[in-house]
Amino acid sequence: MNYIKAGKWLTVFLTFLGILLFIDLFPKEEHDQKTKSKQKPDYRAAYHFTTPDKWKNDPQKPIYFDGKYHYFYLYNRDYPKGNGTEWRHAVSEDLVHWTDEGVAIPKYTNPDGDIWTGSVVVDKENTAGFGKNALVAIVTQPSAKDKKQEQYLWYSTDKGKSFKFYSGNPVMPNPGTDDFRDPKVIWDDQDNKWVMVMAEGSKIGFYESDNLKDWHYTSGFFPEQAGMVECPDLYMMRASDGTNKWVLGASANGKPWGKPNTYAYWTGSFDGKEFKADQTEAQWLDYGFDWYGGVTFEDSKSTDPLEKRYALAWMNNWDYANNTPTMKNGFNGTDSVIRELRLKEQDGTYSLVSQPIEALEQLTVSTDEIEDQDVNGSKTLSITGDTYQLDTDLSWSELKNAGVRLRESEDQKRHIDVGIFAEGGYAYVNRAATNQPDKSNTYVESKAPYDVNKRKVHLKILVDKTTIEVFVGDGKTVFSNEVFPKPEDKGITLYSDGGTASFKNITVKHFDSIHE
């Protein structure tokens, strides 16, 4: 009897204790759900470079110095309420992970306005007189007197941590034109001198100097169907057939002629004073809406620096630069992934081809390999994600349209489409069915010609929280676009219209974040 009574009392006690625990846990669970629902969505890209806060736009050409890549970019600490840019500094050993070094050239420290785009070089032979291996930057600033665009020299003797204003500024006064900016400086090994290209409205000016201080005009290049040019670029590359070619590039506006508003380039010859293009019509490094202010730079670790180069750009567009939910996370400014460039010869034409740098592969945390799929209609994959690289070989016999829907919602109403419109003869990226920055809906489908008679294509697609970059085939055609899907939209669907499409070698590499 005593044992039975004790057992009953124990049962009652445990039941009462369980009720108390349930009452205590239920409100906590409800509170956790409410707290979770109030958390801000994370719109910071996982593996793309982003400004720590506020605003960034134009990249400056990175340099390799003292075992690291040094990257400067335009930064506005007062955004969105105040104007004016300055140069912020970051360093990297692998071009994937970056360490912020803070502001290197602050704005408004002299009467000549804020700091705009320019370029920085390592003065290995002390041609400017600031010391061997001094970093010398030439940047555009609006003059104190009449706000005209002029070129000013700053120099650093502490490995780019800070820069001093040269007392002899400006080194290039305005010659009497409205547009006179974005100087890009390179060393010409053939003639042992510095060469500069300058954006001058619809013209690219060429200049030379022995000491980075005294500059002389040598010639001008007038692009066709490129509109106003900015951020010019000049470099030599060795093509796939062994030919050395000079490449002249610039951010350009081809929209009035149905062309991109990204990075235009011309291959040709350069004699140290004048550039002559192989053909007058520009080629384009990117067909998306958001690859602007692009810069290229040397692979300084390579034994053959002419074989390949690197490139990156600001992923935004001046037509809608401030339309971004990333401000919920306190910033507006994302770069493209760094890509590897090679110069390919085909049928007598030389073209740049791009692929993401291999160093991105180190971010892979898991890989999904999906069996080959024949699709007539649509097929949703079981895997999901918002930070990954997807590769597939797409082929067909007869069809109108085929591709991949990315960042798809559960009800399949929201998505981004990447594919080949065989009936129209072009590749495309369409962001109309997801959140995206262009509120006018003018820039929703980016497209580029594609030879559909091949009846096959390899697609390499980089997906991040706010970006999508598509490398078509060998990478001669690339699309870079901003997108702002809801964080929960992570589906992937294969589709075809008007016939059967075959998707083979489907691989999805899920990437880790570069942020701590």
Swiss-Prot record:
Entry keywords, A to Z: Carbohydrate metabolism, Cell membrane, Glycosidase, Hydrolase, Membrane, Transmembrane, Transmembrane helix
Active site: 58
Transmembrane segments: 6-26
Cellular localization per UniProt: Cell membrane
Induction details: Induced by sucrose.
Entry's Gene Ontology BP terms: sucrose catabolic process
Superkingdom assignment: Bacteria
Binding-site residues, substrate: 55-58, 116-117, 181-182, 230, 318
GO molecular function terms noted in the UniProt entry: 2,6-beta-fructan 6-levanbiohydrolase activity; sucrose alpha-glucosidase activity
Family from the record: Belongs to the glycosyl hydrolase 32 family.
Function per UniProt: Catalyzes the degradation of levan mainly into levanbiose (difructose). Is not active on sucrose.
Protein name: Levanbiose-producing levanase
Species assigned in the record: Bacillus subtilis (strain 168)
